[in-house]
Amino acid sequence: MGNINSIQTKNYIKFEKYYYAGDLNVDNLPHGRGLMLYENGNSFFGHFINGKKHGKGIYIDKNLTKYISKWKYDHISNKVKVKQFDSDIVYLFYYKNGLIDHCKVYEYISNKKKKKKKKNDGILEDSEIQNRSINFEKDNIMIIQNCQEKSIVNKKEEIIDIPNNKYNENDDTDKVDNFSKKINLEQSQNNMLKYKKKKTFDEMNSLNDSIFCSSCESTSKSIGSDYISHFEKKEKQINKQEDELKKSKENYMNHSEYSNSSTNFENNKIKDISDESIMLRLKNIINNNTDLKIENYELWNKEQVAQWLSLCNVPMKWALSVYKNNINGQRLNNLNLYFIRNKLGILSYGQAIKFLQLIKNLRVTAYNTRFSNTLNLEEYEIYLKKKMKKKKMRENKDGEYTATTSSQAEDFQKNNQKIIMNQIKSMIDQKNDDDKSFSDKIKNGFFKGNTNIRNLQNLVINSIWNKSKDEFKIPIDENNVPMNIEKGKELNTNDQITGKKKKKLKNKYINHIQKNISMLKKLNNASNESQSSNESVTQILSTSSESSFANIHSGLSSKMLFHDKLEPEPIKPNKEKEENNPNLSPIINSKNETNLLNDSNPTKLQDELPKSPCSIDSESSSEKSSETSSETSSFCSEHSEFANFHNNNKIVKYSNNIYINSSLAFSYIYSFIIPPENLTFLYQIRNYYVRDVENDLNPNNELDFCDSFNFYKNCEIIKNRIINPGIRNCSYASNHSKFQQNKNRKYFNYSDCKNERKKTKPQKMKSRVFRGRYMGKDVAIKVLVGNIKNFTKFHKVLYKLYILRHTNIALIMGVSISYPFVFIIYEYIKNLCLFSYLHCVKYKHIYVSKLLKYYQKKFINQNFQQQNNTMSSDRKYISNDDNEKINFDSRNILRNKLLEIKCKNNAKNKITEKNNLKDEQIYSSSTSIKSLDTSSSNMNNTKLKNINFNKNRYINKIHSMFRNKNNILCGNYYYLFRKKKNNISISHEHKNSDRTIFTNESQNLLKNKISQKKINKKLNFKAKIKINRPYAFPPLQEDFNFYLEKKKKKKKILFSYLKTHSYFKSKKCDSRKNKLSDHQIMKIIMDITLACSYLEKQKVRWINLKPTNILLDGSLNAKISDFGIKEIEQCLDINIDYSYIVFPNNVIKFNNKHFKNKIKKIKIVNKGSEDMLHVFSSKNHIYKYNTREINVSSNTHNSSVFFWTSPEILKGKQSPSLYSDVYAYGIILWELMTNSVPFNYRFKSHLLASVGYAKESLPFQNIPPFIKNLIKSCINRNKYKRPTFDRILIEISMIYEQINPKEEDALMSFMDG
């Protein structure tokens, strides 16, 4: 959790094996209630007597499992209740004479069986777990008498007379008198009980507050004979009395219903009447009333509605429930399923639908009867005759109109073309006068009033027909007259042959149209805006007139046209074009007004205009993307294309085998769903930090993580390493004071380096976020694992999060699905999180090529010695600044020589690799690099050869791990046997390879372990097992494992990506923690509250607020990330049934049988900045892969315990919600004000015991009172007393006004200018 040296020891007393906080006796021994924190990570909270455990207590181990029991002088009295942190299963271990006798397992606990927990202790009671076979039966009359006796005994202040008359069944008057008297008795008893409760709770709260600073006198009364305090016994009695009084009230109320048997139907008091009497009355009403006018059903009363239901042959219960709820004919129209099932009592879903169907039939019959009464058949026949005559007249007019000649149509077209061209020229002249672009006028609706432009599309279509008469003939009538197409008339449906030909020709010439449109686009992009628009119009008209197009119906405007990429042709001057094209036909392709402005097909009017820079950027980015993403990127750049997806019946298959219809494909292209092929993973975002406990580090110190984790582990090699005093290779020796003394030494002192690295060794923060790129932008990619349960719910949740827009929120750019993974793409923020900014030493991460580092390590000594031989002896006395320059120049020389060295080595490695092909067929890419040529002219010394040989052998062994190209993605692998160092013996015979072979002894041990696991699985299903082990507390882990369900390890999944061979060096920037000013703190707090209040209004259930999710940019603007992750994970099934190996292009899924036959074991090895996957095959070979480890959250809500988690979650009572976010907000406020980590314990079990059960509070020193009150209200242990984020925002605005009055704000704004 925190630092080793940062345990809060102010209120704790240190003993030999633990720290203690609580009550003490005279001898300073634990006496009373207190908390023990053991050095091994365990903790205990309970009662003590003279330093021994005596009473109830909770023991919590490292794994956060709770052991609840009663103690007698450091010995367990009867049983131990064991409960894991992430599960609801409870185990009871029973002890007899110091031995574990048997165990009971309870798989489920209902909330009804749980008793109220004590308010003075956070300890769970034994009565939570009850056996289902036990049933308690009690008499109500005996409870009332016992309750009266217990409540009145030993009361001196008040005396109440209790009647001793028993209940007589014959006397009704005595019943009423007794009932009225007992009500008065209950009221007086309740008042007295409330008064007693207040006293007891005040006394117990005083005890609760005295855990960390109290004396033995305050808890002397809390220890009794049966280990329960005196106040707890009284509280139990009070709770019993309340339950008994409630039962007595119910009995008397039930009796009063039978005594007052008078039924008044006129006053509609049906609830006090029995159902039998109502049924008799309904039957009489139904038999007497026979007239029901269906057309006037809205005027029915409730009795007529019941009569109608009886005629429909439905159960009488339906009629009775309708009669009870006063449902008349007017209310029938407003009934729904919820009201029918919950109010009327018709619970079954099918019967409720049947009831609604009856109401619908009633409406239809009522409408038909009304219509039949008002309809006159003679008038209707006359209406039909007139309608038939109108149809015949229309058909005759259409035949006459189609008989016009083609010459008349051409003349009409030419006249319209001249009028349109004159209007366009006048508009262009107006553009030059006003200095406005032609495109702005179109976007502002300039053409909306011009009716002639509506016919532009028809003119272009007719011109295309005239140009392409040879290729395609216009359909003609019997009189050899061409049909007019100007108004978009449909062809004769009887001619099926012509229709088929037309469809074929349409499909044939669509590609030709696309090419011309894309060519026109690129011509317009290359043209200058300064040229007149007349020239651009003539250019496009010339290209459109020469090209031969097919006839396109106006209905094709709704379909999509994908544009092919063509190289733009150079634009010719106007004179050359007029010579080449003397006859220009002014034809312009256009559409309706809506299609001119909002259409996916780029019209030629739009092509004439200069494009905006955003559209040009989108085209350039689409060209660089892959072929699959080229189409989608062009559509995503234009937002006016939403009217193009009309075909909802098509099915599209994507590369990840997801079949979706075109409506979902619309969201796939335009919305937040991104194809996984367009994502590129660069590296995993891992924050390396060093806690600034000891400020002994210099700011210029450099840490080489690759060296510290990999290359300095072999002590023999490093001890023999020579460091030149003139040019140092080790970064540790350059700056630190201890290494300044070792300037003239020839050999490197490994012990000093090791001690320094222990102090400055960085810690790695776990994350499952990668840095990547999408559409040329840097993004942050979060990896979630699991199969999608319900895609519709998943789609709604993601769309809800995708819509959210706020300046203080990390925006979600999209989501990508690749089973079994879900990738959420956020915007990338470069700076660190709030936690690392406040509490961690900063490092700059510099990414360097892996091969460069390899050759630097391998040949650094050779190059340095060559230079040193040529240098003069005066070189030794050069200053440190000159040494750094020389070191930098030498590295540049190495980089230039790397290619030459690499070419020489490849020629020699080919010969050696051919001999090892038989043994290396499984994975050829993991073959080790042979030692390079060390027999150069300058390396004649044998000692230097031996040193380089040993060093190269070690470097080759490590570097072969990272050289492997078979990067895999593994899912849900589990260990088939436990790892023990003593049992596994690995032979390192293959020095230059990554394989090791097991011995025969280790194989036999593995088989025995597998057989033992099978036996343990059978024992899990038994409810009682006799163990007969000696006394142990807590129970031995082996005994506890008998009863645990043997599940596969599904919390860890290995994710790998195409790795660019790189590692990073980290250079420390600051040696001290960052301290924020008051204005910066208020700015960060305002940003957080604004974001949280916005998310609260958007009804996000859980924000997951914590310091690591608050990101800061360069100007310290706070942004919240990871909100809504809980809702997404609820839609995922993390328990995946299969294991996956995902290669770059395909996915292999195999089951457990395949796993056992081919692979024995898979193990993760953490080596600094790299995670290695070791795969043990059936042939006892080890394959090593370069991977990344991701911590997948479990299905339970208690997956993490940190200092910002609320106490109700620490106890495991409730799931996280906005109340827990308010608690975390208060912790963050305290963290900002004090610049320290709250509850900074070493183990999570210590935090759970102290904060969850011992109720430890935070110190509020040097915090202003107005912020102190806000923090206390947010950290309140009662979650319902915590404020909302809207209320917090109001309070913070008031605080800001107090800190910065109006005069100061005015002065600051004046100084800023």
UniProtKB/Swiss-Prot annotation:
<feature type="glycosylation site" description="N-linked (GlcNAc...) asparagine">
    <location>
        <position position="983"/>
    </location>
</feature>
<dbReference type="InterPro" id="IPR001245">
    <property type="entry name" value="Ser-Thr/Tyr_kinase_cat_dom"/>
</dbReference>
<keyword id="KW-0067">ATP-binding</keyword>
<dbReference type="GO" id="GO:0030430">
    <property type="term" value="C:host cell cytoplasm"/>
</dbReference>
<dbReference type="InterPro" id="IPR013761">
    <property type="entry name" value="SAM/pointed_sf"/>
</dbReference>
<dbReference type="InterPro" id="IPR003409">
    <property type="entry name" value="MORN"/>
</dbReference>
<dbReference type="InterPro" id="IPR000719">
    <property type="entry name" value="Prot_kinase_dom"/>
</dbReference>
<feature type="glycosylation site" description="N-linked (GlcNAc...) asparagine">
    <location>
        <position position="178"/>
    </location>
</feature>
<keyword id="KW-1032">Host cell membrane</keyword>
<dbReference type="GO" id="GO:0016020">
    <property type="term" value="C:membrane"/>
</dbReference>
<keyword id="KW-0677">Repeat</keyword>
<feature type="glycosylation site" description="N-linked (GlcNAc...) asparagine">
    <location>
        <position position="254"/>
    </location>
</feature>
<feature type="glycosylation site" description="N-linked (GlcNAc...) asparagine">
    <location>
        <position position="525"/>
    </location>
</feature>
<feature type="compositionally biased region" description="Polar residues">
    <location>
        <begin position="586"/>
        <end position="604"/>
    </location>
</feature>
<feature type="glycosylation site" description="N-linked (GlcNAc...) asparagine">
    <location>
        <position position="516"/>
    </location>
</feature>
<feature type="glycosylation site" description="N-linked (GlcNAc...) asparagine">
    <location>
        <position position="868"/>
    </location>
</feature>
<feature type="glycosylation site" description="N-linked (GlcNAc...) asparagine">
    <location>
        <position position="534"/>
    </location>
</feature>
<feature type="glycosylation site" description="N-linked (GlcNAc...) asparagine">
    <location>
        <position position="661"/>
    </location>
</feature>
<feature type="glycosylation site" description="N-linked (GlcNAc...) asparagine">
    <location>
        <position position="260"/>
    </location>
</feature>
<dbReference type="InterPro" id="IPR001660">
    <property type="entry name" value="SAM"/>
</dbReference>
<feature type="glycosylation site" description="N-linked (GlcNAc...) asparagine">
    <location>
        <position position="528"/>
    </location>
</feature>
<feature type="glycosylation site" description="N-linked (GlcNAc...) asparagine">
    <location>
        <position position="729"/>
    </location>
</feature>
<feature type="binding site">
    <location>
        <position position="782"/>
    </location>
    <ligand>
        <name>ATP</name>
    </ligand>
</feature>
<keyword id="KW-1035">Host cytoplasm</keyword>
<dbReference type="GO" id="GO:0005524">
    <property type="term" value="F:ATP binding"/>
</dbReference>
<feature type="glycosylation site" description="N-linked (GlcNAc...) asparagine">
    <location>
        <position position="1198"/>
    </location>
</feature>
<feature type="glycosylation site" description="N-linked (GlcNAc...) asparagine">
    <location>
        <position position="208"/>
    </location>
</feature>
<feature type="glycosylation site" description="N-linked (GlcNAc...) asparagine">
    <location>
        <position position="940"/>
    </location>
</feature>
<feature type="glycosylation site" description="N-linked (GlcNAc...) asparagine">
    <location>
        <position position="592"/>
    </location>
</feature>
<feature type="glycosylation site" description="N-linked (GlcNAc...) asparagine">
    <location>
        <position position="678"/>
    </location>
</feature>
<dbReference type="GO" id="GO:0044163">
    <property type="term" value="C:host cytoskeleton"/>
</dbReference>
<dbReference type="InterPro" id="IPR051681">
    <property type="entry name" value="Ser/Thr_Kinases-Pseudokinases"/>
</dbReference>
<keyword id="KW-0325">Glycoprotein</keyword>
<keyword id="KW-0547">Nucleotide-binding</keyword>
<feature type="short sequence motif" description="RVxF motif">
    <location>
        <begin position="1052"/>
        <end position="1055"/>
    </location>
</feature>
<feature type="glycosylation site" description="N-linked (GlcNAc...) asparagine">
    <location>
        <position position="749"/>
    </location>
</feature>
<dbReference type="Pfam" id="PF02493">
    <property type="entry name" value="MORN"/>
</dbReference>
<feature type="glycosylation site" description="N-linked (GlcNAc...) asparagine">
    <location>
        <position position="131"/>
    </location>
</feature>
<feature type="compositionally biased region" description="Basic and acidic residues">
    <location>
        <begin position="569"/>
        <end position="580"/>
    </location>
</feature>
<feature type="domain" description="Protein kinase">
    <location>
        <begin position="962"/>
        <end position="1294"/>
    </location>
</feature>
<feature type="glycosylation site" description="N-linked (GlcNAc...) asparagine">
    <location>
        <position position="598"/>
    </location>
</feature>
<protein>
    <recommendedName>
        <fullName>Inactive protein tyrosine kinase pTKL</fullName>
    </recommendedName>
</protein>
